[in-house]
Amino acid sequence: MMATLTTAISPQGPYVGRFAPSPSGALHFGSLVAALGSYLRARSLGGKWLIRIEDIDPPREVKGAADDILRTLEAYGFEWDDTVLYQSARTDAYQAKLDQLLAQDDAYFCQCSRKQIQAMGGIYDGRCHQLATPHQSGAIRLVNRAQVAEFTDNLMGKVVVDHDFATEDFIIKRSDGLYAYQLAVVLDDAHQGISEVVRGCDLIEASCRQLSLYQSLGLTAPQWLHLPLACLTPGFKLSKQNHAQAIDKQHPQASLNAALTFLGQSTVEPTSAAQMLAQAVAQFELTAVPKQREIILTA
């Protein structure tokens, strides 16, 4: 039975969560942990759970991966609400906001190379914003006036990031013309009405930049809940880029229970995937999830 939504989570309305994979390869165990954690959180609060495919980086995408991800989620018993949102269908919205930010002097073009930024100490110093004749091409950076340096995570507690990282004017459109993750994720979470972002701790620092962008855009930010990362060794997470093994679509029961154990939850009877998820939702306890950024997997 689903728990009653608490107003502490989303005073503006019903809980809305999401899982937003990139189609750069098949889902692996780390992906399953993120999907499961966000699903259990949303369903245990009686909320909606949405799927978004973050397909705005074609050089990293694998043909057919988006469909494979959806079929894998189905094989694991996940049921999502509404239609799947593809970021590639949202580029007009991204560009409209970029144009608005540029017109308001809340963003500017930058032509500094990585080598030049390294010479600045690795943190960009905003020099292109000070030019008498501004650039009209290159990467686009946000004028980071909000400079959010800390926030409260609903699992990890108070999160504080490095001052230089928090104050840097960060890129919101790349020099190759592709929209940066920070811009797309903020606009899409706002567009979909996401009330709480549940994802891995590899993105925990990025939340401060996203909060700065929310303020610049005049948008209401969601709450945050970052889950432990599945790592092979300290600092080396399972990822598609690291060629992590795809989870088995034919036999989901063992992987589901392994992911539940990883999240500190009790295992469930290995019946159908859908029945397992229903039981896992009914007994989900956020307080049991380990409050650590990494968990090293053992053989």
UniProtKB/Swiss-Prot annotation:
It comes from Shewanella oneidensis (strain ATCC 700550 / JCM 31522 / CIP 106686 / LMG 19005 / NCIMB 14063 / MR-1). The gene is gluQ. A motif ('HIGH' region) lies at residues 21-31. PANTHER family: GLUTAMATE--TRNA LIGASE, GLUTAMYL-Q TRNA(ASP) SYNTHETASE. ATP binds at K240. The keyword Metal-binding applies. It is an enzyme of class 6 (ligase). This is Glutamyl-Q tRNA(Asp) synthetase. Binds 1 zinc ion per subunit.
